[in-house]
Structures are given as structure tokens and as C-alpha cells.
Amino acid sequence: MRHYEIVFIVHPDQSEQVPAMIDRYKATLAAVGGKIHRMEDWGRRQMAYMIDKLAKAHYVCMNIECDQKTLEELEHAFKFNDAVLRHLIIKTKKAETEPSIMMKEVQHEEARKSAQSDAPVAAA
């Protein structure tokens, strides 16, 4: 089996459906003995350029190990899911299990926001 990194971008109006999509893709992999080494939900982020007049979208990254047939099934599912705006599949040499740079940035932003909300409000 080969290792792949998959990033897919979901329409922002369908963000609440992302966990169900992820579960469906996990089930597809599990049915044939594939493995998920890393699953990251990057959340709603600004896109580099507009797609279908949208400036923001929901990003998900998966590092998986599967055979070619399963990869084709996943790609087919991405193509025919109207909520998926774009997808990218990259073959990697080994399994990536540590958090990606994007996920570290997301965690940093969340920590910064929680620190700001916990800070006492200065009296004016």
C-alpha cells in the first residue's frame, strides 16, 4: 500500500456536514484495510483566490495509506460531491503523523483567542 496526503476544500455553507463526510471517507478506507495516519480539520479559512464567488471555505487534510483502487474510489467520491469545491491528492514516501504547519497555526490562533477572552477587560 502507498501513502497519500489528501486536502479537500468544502463549501462554507456545508461546514456542518464535514464530520459526516470525514466519517464516510474513513468508512471507505476501513472497509478495504486502509489506514488513516493523520486527520486534521483546519476549519473555515480564507482562500488564496475566489472559487464560485466564495472567499472562504472549510479545509480538511488527511494522511492515509491505501491501495490504488481505494484511492480511485475516494477521488470519485470527491468529484461527485457538490459540497467539495477542490481536492488535491499527493503521493508521499512515508506516513506523516505529526501535526502539519497549518494545524500548528490553527492551534496557535485558538490559543491566542482563548487567552484574549480570558484576559480581564480594562476599565475605560
Swiss-Prot record:
Region described as Disordered: spans on this chain: 105-124
Superkingdom of origin: Bacteria
GO BP annotation list: translation
Disulfide bridge positions per record: none
Segments forming a coiled coil: none
Keywords assigned: Ribonucleoprotein, Ribosomal protein, RNA-binding, rRNA-binding
One cellular component term from this protein's GO annotations in UniProt: cytosolic small ribosomal subunit
GO molecular function, one term: structural constituent of ribosome
Pfam families: Ribosomal_S6
Biased composition (Basic and acidic residues): 105-115
Xref: InterPro entries: Ribosomal_bS6 (IPR000529), Ribosomal_bS6_sf (IPR035980), Ribosomal_S6_plastid/chlpt (IPR020814), Transl_elong_EF1B/ribsomal_bS6 (IPR014717)
Gene3D superfamilies (alphabetical): 3.30.70.60
Role according to the record: Binds together with bS18 to 16S ribosomal RNA.
Similarity section: Belongs to the bacterial ribosomal protein bS6 family.
Protein name per the record: Small ribosomal subunit protein bS6
Organism the protein comes from: Polynucleobacter necessarius subsp. necessarius (strain STIR1)
Gene this protein is translated from: rpsF
